[in-house]
Amino acid sequence: MSDLDIQIPTAFDPFSEANAGDSGAAAGSKDYVHVRIQQRNGRKSLTTVQGLKKEFSYNKILKDLKKEFCCNGTVVQDPELGQVIQLQGDQRKNVSNFLVQAGIVKKEHIKIHGF
């Protein structure tokens, strides 16, 4: 009875999809900008933008996003993912349209995750 194969449930990691592709195609996966939604509490949600090039000013992009969509946001420094922009609410489509119209990213290089 000691040979039982039991899987223990672990915490959900919303960034696990981005980390899964790092082993095989490191150069190809770095080209994408990932726009995700995370559920906070109740009906509240958080939109994260990850994978923008380092030469962009994250604070200027955040300032324009906050002004355009009338929401609050911040730039978070993650040890594995680098800088990540966080916005309040479900802003996935708005952010992807904004990044394409501003010429920051091409539409083919945006991946939208969530629900």
Curated annotation (Swiss-Prot):
Q: Which GO terms describe its molecular function?
A: translation initiation factor activity
User: Does the record bear Glycosyltransferase in its keywords?
Assistant: no
**GO biological process entries:** regulation of translation
Q: Which PROSITE patterns match?
A: SUI1
Q: Give the record's keywords alphabetically.
A: Protein biosynthesis, Translation regulation
Q: Name one Pfam family in it.
A: SUI1
Report the protein's function: Probably involved in translation.
Q: Which InterPro entries match?
A: SUI1, SUI1_dom_sf, SUI1_euk
Protein family according to the UniProt entry = Belongs to the SUI1 family.
Q: What is this protein called?
A: Protein translation factor SUI1 homolog
Cystine pairs annotated here are none
